[in-house]
Amino acid sequence: MNIQCLSFINCYTTCLLYTSRTDMRKSIDGLCAIIQEQFSMEIDHALFLFCGRKCDRIKAILKEPDGIVMIYKRLTAQGSYRWPRNKSEVRNLTWREFDWLMSGIDIEQPKAIKAT
């Protein structure tokens, strides 16, 4: 999954990452409940990313005009996502950080990568 594969997402203004471990058995309703009940946020106009105990799979939800979409990705190789686990929070990501995360790059790197 990279930003090119999900080109339809760029119309969403915000990419938000839930840093705490998520029970990956949760459905759309369960993931929406995390956002609405723990953080008093609505899911409109944002892509929300979730990761479980194993960092080899993620879920994402986003709201469209006619419903809510859930995307699930499990890495098939030995790789894993470098998911920030500071505390239970929703963290705002730039689209560049989203692309780094999907590419396996740590988004909490001490030095920024220079744009080419």
Regions found by a protein language model. Name each.
Residues 41-55:
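Conserved interaction-surface patches within small, structured recognition/assembly domains
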Residues 61, 65-82:
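Compact nucleic-acid interaction/catalytic patches
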Residues 22-23:
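Domain-level signal for Mg2+-assisted phosphodiester chemistry and nucleotide/NA-binding surfaces
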Residues 18-19:
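Conserved small/polar residues in nucleotide/adenosyl-binding loops
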Residues 85-116:
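C-terminal low-complexity, charged extensions that often adopt amphipathic alpha-helices
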Residues 26, 60-61:
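Mobile genetic element proteins and their domesticated derivatives, centered on retroelements
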